[in-house]
């Protein structure tokens, strides 16, 4: 029974698709005339009419209650009758698109030229990656290659890829002016007749690679025994490159291209290339896209900060990435010389592989790594330039409208304030602005979808009612792909997941590829019936594609099985891009069975949301408990601080009291100390006087002694003299006596 359903459903899809493909190509390729985009007044009239249209073409839109809508409806009566209006609104809401008219046949606008440059750089980068892998496989199996060097498919494929890379590098060097012209062009509505150059640019990177890779595959089939797993992986990579490049070629060769699709393709390609490179920062002009999405996304929907982004972008001057382009050309010249030295041999004779310089591959690989890094920088610059072009288109239309109105009224050219922008953008033009500015949201949703719903095809699993609860809880961390370590990170992740599931749910139910005008967090505050800007299901003139349904959805399945089947359903209802329908409006026509299918999916999503809400509440309770503990701890800390402050104050008071007492005692003892000092001074004076008196007395005594000594000496002298005189007298007397006796 299940197989029968699948067969019938597949037949139904085939019939629908056949009818779609057989529709009129003129109706299919006809888009919005460029006059609508260039003329802000007509564009704004479309927006106003759609805003007040009761039978709106925006699915899920609530009927307006604006009192000004009565006058607007009168103005738009005739316009609503025209089919051109419905087509214009359809294409405007799905993305800006150029009309396929005779005026621009054979010409491409700046955005398309930049897209072709991005595609060429992308293929150039993939060729470098394939060559690096081939070199690594050769280095890992050097000993085998030395033994079988003449007929080795690894060397053959490596030489062919080096020749392809050399031709690309030579082509870039010869067409430097074309690259510089694309990088330095200004954002204008004028078209440049460079289609032939762009086609040669694309064919240089794709067609030669395709033909040479086919020959490479034929050679590899002859030498399957020698070929290893690395070589097989290289072949798969090159084949994938061909497929992606062919898809890009078919998209580029269409008569008209969607500016929004252009922006989306490079964003998704760029996101895939740097999926594991956290150091790469994508910028919208000079504004980092990640910061805008994480911080300003919800405010941007209401118009806040919207024009700040535009003004910051318009503040830039000159060409972007000129230094990157110069480095790219210089490094490419070195790569070309290196490749020329290695690939001088004649590939027609396989015996020439004996002279293949294996030792030079290490140097070549190092140069390729540097070249790839410069190539990434150049590609980022080109993407930024393309986003600037789209921003300037929107801004120029608005400014020209304001200037024209001022000239009609005889007023000076106005300086437009942020409030004026916000008031008018809220009426509908914001849908288109966000379409151009935030196409990055699509890549984020695709990442979320890939993490929630795995893409692997697995068979149906048996129903296990006992394990219904465990898978639901375990499926929660896998929604984000990682399990945070801290509670705060877990809460933030769950909040983000719940918001994104609400956002994704609307995408699933309404089958709309445009970003949500009202995000989930704001829809709770505003009208719950406000939904994304999409198209009505009754538009039968637009083509679509389906993935084949693998198995049908069963409400009794286990939750893990349901999640996997939801992924299959999403793949089924995701339109493919090919050469016929990539630029047309993508709509989904659902049958009764499919509606039941989606309703069941919606119910399961609600269950997942409820479980996430329960987990969130538990975490909130847990964090509230932690907050209470933290509050108590903080209160204790505050009390301790208060006590410490009080004790410190008391100690200070005590110290002050003690110091005051000491000062008082010192002051009281001060006069006593003075008296004692005076007494001591007096005593010292008395001592000094006494010493002086004693000295004087001693001196006087000495003088007396000296005088006495002098007196004694004098007396002794006198005595001596007297004795001498007496002796003399005695001597004289005997003589006389002798004389007398003699007589």
UniProtKB/Swiss-Prot annotation:
Signal peptide (residue range): 1-23
Q: Where is this region: 8 X 6 AA tandem repeats of [VT]-N-D-[ED]-[ED]-D?
A: 226-273
Q: sequence repeat ranges?
A: 226-231, 232-237, 238-243, 244-249, 250-255, 256-261, 262-267, 268-273
Feature: compositional bias, Basic and acidic residues: 459-473, 672-722
Lineage: superkingdom = Eukaryota
Composition bias type Acidic residues, residue spans: 226-274, 723-733
The way this protein sits in the membrane is described as: Peripheral membrane protein
**The UniProt record lists the keyword Ribosomal protein:** no
Role of this protein: During the asexual blood stage, involved in the sialic acid-independent (SAID) merozoite invasion of host erythrocytes by binding to host SLC4A1/Band 3 protein on the surface of the host erythrocyte.
Assembly information from the UniProt record: Forms a complex composed of MSP1, MSP6, MSP7, MSP9 and MSP3; within the complex, MSP6 and MSP9 mediate the binding to the host erythrocyte. Interacts with MSP1 subunits p19 and p42; the interaction is direct. Interacts with host SLC4A1/Band 3 protein (via the 5ABC region). MSP1 subunits p19 or p42, and MSP9 form a co-ligand complex that interacts with host SLC4A1/Band 3 protein.
Q: What is this protein called?
A: Merozoite surface protein 9
Please give the organism.
Answer: Plasmodium falciparum (isolate Camp / Malaysia)
